[in-house]
């Protein structure tokens, strides 16, 4: 979280200090605005009766969404660095190392949750719902598409619409 929307406001000594150049801050805002809008478009609960649909709050969850994306990218790099000496392991149960990496990430965030709790968490929790931590995050990561040979489909996000914060 040291380089998310909150952590970036602190310098190397932990003091709140605007240490970024104006250009860096502007570029960060452009990228994070895209991520906020991606999450804002996620319907977490459909309209029901006279109740409108409930949408994810990309601004509320921005720091965590940045951390999820950054953590995935760093851990993926670490995984591949571990292959340098011994090579990439053989597929297991038909899944490559990259596929198992992303399947493991998705498995972590599985939830069984009631609609009332989804509505509450969407309004107060800085973390995106588990489903969105997986689907919305992975949509921006090229190596995910490569791992599964994804070229189009409902969850496909065209390359020009993807955003990588770090």
Give the label of every model feature segment.
Residues 1-166:
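Zinc-dependent metallohydrolase catalytic domains
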């Amino acid at each position: 979280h040291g380089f998310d929307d909150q952590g970036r406001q602190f310098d190397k000594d932990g003091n709140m200090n605007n240490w970024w150049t104006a250009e860096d801050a502007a570029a960060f805002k452009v990228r994070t605005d895209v991520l906020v809008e991606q999450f804002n478009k996620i319907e977490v609960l459909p309209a029901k009766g006279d109740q409108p649909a409930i949408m994810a709050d990309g601004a509320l969850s921005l720091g965590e969404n940045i951390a999820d994306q950054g953590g995935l990218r760093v851990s993926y790099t670490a995984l591949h660095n571990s292959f340098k000496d011994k090579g990439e392991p053989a597929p297991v149960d038909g899944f490559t190392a990259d596929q198992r990496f992303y399947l493991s990430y998705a498995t972590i965030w599985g939830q069984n949750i009631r609609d009332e709790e989804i509505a509450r968490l969407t309004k107060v929790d800085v973390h995106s719902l588990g489903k969105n931590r997986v689907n919305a995050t992975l949509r921006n990561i090229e190596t995910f598409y490569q791992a599964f040979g994804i070229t189009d489909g409902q969850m496909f996000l065209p390359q020009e619409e993807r955003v990588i914060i770090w």
